[in-house]
Structure formats: structure tokens, C-alpha cells
Amino acid sequence: MSLHYTLSVVQASKVGSNLPKPMPPQIEESLSGSDQSAALWMGMAKWFGEDIRSVLDKIRTISFHEVEEIRLRVGQPLLVRTSDEDIFINREGKVSSPDQAHIVNREDLACALERMTHSSVYAAEEDLKKGFLTLPGGNRVGVTGEAILQNGQIQTMKHISSLNLRIARDIPGRGFKILPLLLGTGGILCHTLLISPPRAGKTTLLRDLIRIISDGVPQLGFRGQTVGVVDERGELAGMWQGVPTYNLGYRTDVLDGCPKASGMNMIIRSMAPQVMAMDELGHSDDVTAIEDALRTGVRILSTAHASSLEEALVRPTLAHLLEQGVFERLVVLSRKHGPGTIDGVYDLKTGRIL
């Protein structure tokens, strides 16, 4: 099965022989302010070809810490998205109107894909079929184009037209605020589901909770737990050649790039975790795997896309798990006051807001 990769041929000089290395989430900590932002922009720019890289390297008026997405669309202006606005960028790296911004062309996308797949687009075919790539460090790249179907299933993609690089953030400490609300009788972690719409910080919060649960919290009398993480899309740990980019704790074992359903069974058999963590429940196979996992006594910690309990209940997979009483706590996140805003923590057994 081959990927019909129909973008223009990329010159070696455009891609460069030294492909990007993973960028740690705390890159250039010795720098501060604008210098640190510039260093982070340069680190991210390495994933792109010469033209886009030149633009991003020049950015000085937009703090990298505020950026959530970098979007490339063929024939459209280069766009940087923050939490509250869309910003168009010209060839000098300055904020501009759409008609004065750098216009993305097919070669810009071709160069970026070559670098993001380490010059092996075919090796990334399975991810591209799902519509995304995951870069070292947990940064995720959405991909759209023309889907090629076989028996109603996407087999490949051609004429790639858009890339959306979503920048992963590691914000330690947020989990401390809600962990006490997730503990039940005897200080045992409750089966917990975190829900939010896209870009509202549920993966960031899940990552922090994993680390805290793994390390333990002496102040709460909460001992560290063995945590098994099934990181299907590579966003939680940001694994690079077997080493996690993000700190997930002393007692955490990560299964990277494996479908959640088969991964849960595998990690339970091999690592005997006390807590099983995963991102973005949604497939029907996930239900059976979670029900099997519960029989072993493992605690479940997961996320899903939904903006409210009512919305979650109209999604078949989530509705089944919620109606069966699998989850004991529900954490609802939003962007009301920026990503990671906690709208409420609910005790699903009593219906109370904690």
C-alpha cells in the first residue's frame, strides 16, 4: 500500500541534510523574555523548509509562549493562532494583513512533510491515513488533502493542501488543584474522565495528573502509584527513540504508538499498573478494553472530546461507559479564561459538584 504523495519534488538544498532533533519543552531555560521566545521560534522553524523557516526565524513581536497553532494552507496566507486571535505573518516575520502576508505554496508543504517525516513519507503512511503526524515532543500536525477510499475506508491521501502544527505545552502544577477532588474513600483514586472541546487543555492536565499520581503527594498522604500509559498518538509522553520528552513520573510505563484497545490489555499483562491512563476515548473497541481492564482492579484516568456531560451522553462510546457507571469523577474543562479553565468537577455517583 503506497502513499500517493503528489506534492512537488523537493530539492535537497531546501530540506537540508540535518533533519530536526526533538525540541524539549523547556528549551533554552537559561534565556528569558524575548531571547527565549526567539530561541523557541528557531527551534520550531526547523520543521519547515527554507522559505517558512526564514519567516518564523524573524518573528520577534509574537511571544512563542502564546502560540497554539501554526497553519499552512496552499494558496493562503501563513497564519499563527494564539488563544484569542489569528495572526497573519509576512515574509519579514511581522504581523500583517492577509493580503500582505506570506502566501503558502505547495513546495512549503512538501518541504515541511519531508522534514516532519524525516524524509520517509511512506513510513508515516499509517499516521497520514488518520490525518495527523506526531512530532518528537508531542507536537501534533493535522493533515488534510484528497482522501483515496477503498471499500469506504481511507487508504491514503494525496494532493496535501493543509498542515496544522498544534504546539504541545507542559504546564506542571495544575493537577494539584483538583487531585484531592479525585480521591475517594481511603484516598483511592476514582475512575476519572476529563472532557473538553478541542484546544481546551485536557491533554495537558492529564499529563500533569499522571506525573503527580506516579510520584505521589506526601502532603495528602497519597502514595505514588504505578501508572500505565497507552499513548496512541504520542502526545502524552512525546517519546523519542524510547525516551519520553515529558516527565510523567517515577513510576510510569509508556506504550507508545499503540491503539488503546490492544495497548491496555498488553500493558496490564506486562507491567501490572495500578492506574491506566490514556487520551481521547472514542472508539467502540475502547469500551470492551476498559471493561476488561476494570476486572483487574486498575483505576482508569482518561480524556474525551465533549464540552459538557450532556454532550458526552450523546456520543455512543462515552454514553455507554457513563451509563454503566464506569466513571466516578467527571472534570469539565473549557477556554472561558484561557485553555485549562476548570468549569467543574462532578461526583457522578451523587451528581454533586465538588
Which residues are covered by each model-predicted region?
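Conserved nucleotide-binding/hydrolysis micro-motifs of P-loop NTPases
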Residues: R140, A147-Q150, D170-P172, R233-L236, ...
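N-terminal accessory targeting/assembly segments
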Residues: S2-G137
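P-loop NTPase switch/communication element
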Residues: S214-N265
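Conserved P-loop NTPase
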Residues: Q150, Q155-H159, E328-L354
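P-loop NTPase nucleotide-binding module
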Residues: G175-E232
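P-loop NTP-binding catalytic core
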Residues: R115, S119-L189
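Conserved P-loop NTPase nucleotide-binding/switch module
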Residues: M271-L330, R335
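Residue-level signature of catalytic and energy-coupling elements of molecular machines
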Residues: I70, V143, D231
